[in-house]
């Protein structure tokens, strides 16, 4: 466990992916702030998580306050709620690192890639929040159900996008804390690749009957430093 964890707000922390990430980071020694449109819902989620994991460093707040209290903000919200969420937190994230996990899925055709006109959700988020915010886009192709089972040994890689190498590295270290390997994958514009790949993985999982298949980077080199 880490001696001094970071304070991470998970906006959408009551959803499947958000709560799974929050649990993993809490177990890794970080301080977690659950964010939700409903403060009551966030508080209840935090209490359940604390009770389940036997850890006290988790609290719940409405999205704006949750983002204000944290040094790192993670967006794990459905695409339909994405723009509204950005508008809620924009004043609270100035100068901070924001990790964007949102994928532009268009129900019911979630197995078909449908990127925004800007090219990717990651780029939309960076444009909207402004240059003072360091947006990193990641964790698109990770199984929320596998993440949520804290006893499940994860096996997969994560591509990490962003315009600032140091910020990507911070995200990579946090991703390692949940039990996954992560890779620098270039600028925020490149996030389109993983956002589209999510729909591809949904199709593959359904077509072949896989349970949360993901991606893996293969190299002839045994060990590569992130």
Annotate each predicted stretch with a short phrase.
Residues 156-226:
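Active-site-lining helix/loop region of Rossmann-like oxidoreductase modules
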Residues 102-145, 149-150:
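Rossmann-fold NAD(P)-binding glycine/threonine-rich loop
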Residues 60, 134-138, 183-185:
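General beta-strand structural signal in soluble alpha/beta enzymes
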Residues 20, 24, 128, 174:
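Rossmann-fold NAD(P)-dependent oxidoreductase module
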């Amino acid at each position: 466990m880490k001696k001094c964890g970071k304070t991470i707000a998970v906006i959408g922390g009551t959803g499947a992916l958000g709560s799974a990430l929050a649990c993993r980071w809490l177990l890794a020694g970080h301080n977690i702030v659950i964010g939700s449109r409903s403060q009551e819902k966030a508080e209840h989620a935090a209490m359940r998580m604390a009770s389940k994991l036997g850890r006290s460093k988790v609290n719940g707040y409405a999205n704006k306050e949750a983002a204000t209290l944290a040094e790192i903000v993670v967006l794990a919200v459905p695409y339909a709620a994405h723009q509204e969420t950005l508008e809620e937190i924009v004043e609270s994230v100035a100068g901070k690192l924001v990790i964007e996990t949102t994928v532009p899925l268009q129900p019911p055709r979630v197995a078909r890639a449908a990127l925004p006109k800007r090219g990717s959700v990651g780029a939309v988020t960076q444009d909207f929040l402004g240059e003072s915010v360091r947006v990193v886009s990641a964790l698109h192709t990770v199984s929320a159900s596998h993440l949520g089972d804290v006893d499940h040994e994860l096996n997969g890689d994560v591509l990490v996008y962003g315009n600032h190498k140091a910020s990507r590295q911070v995200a990579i270290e946090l991703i390692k804390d949940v039990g996954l390997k992560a890779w620098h994958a270039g600028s925020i514009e490149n996030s389109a690749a993983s956002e589209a790949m999510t729909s591809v993985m949904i199709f593959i999982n359904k077509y072949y009957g896989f349970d949360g298949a993901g991606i893996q980077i293969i190299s002839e080199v045994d060990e590569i430093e992130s």
